[in-house]
Amino acid sequence: MRGQKLAPGDYHLIVHACLFNDAGRLLIQQRQTTKKGWPGLWDVSAGGSALHGETSAQAAAREGREELGLSLDLSGVRPAFTLHFAAGFDDVYILRQNVQVEDLTLQPEEVAAVRFATLAEVQALLQSGRFVPYPKTLLPLYFETAGF
């Protein structure tokens, strides 16, 4: 349950979906200023916590649907990366999907804005403190894995 301390041997599963278009741009979202973690900062396309009993693919598809109104078919898709942190794991899905920003339905409690960005634009946001503070080598790896 959210906010409860994990029992010994239990881990938290986080998921992220990184959507790239054919032009090599990553769909990024700006977190609402009311969010507890990293308010107002830009982040990758969609992400959040898996619910009890969900697979990471189910959680990533749900987050895409909830936050952006996107239908993501992740059946049979494995995460490109599983990142480890002290309390758990973060499964990262790298996806290629051409979507139009104006066709997205943003979840107002979570997402303030979305746009597509190049790696250089994402790195500039990161360097200026306006992007969730991922390790500086991580986002270039996402672009490279997507083929850009």
Model-derived features: positions:
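A glycine-rich, hydrophobic loop/mini-helix early in the fold
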Residues: I14-A46
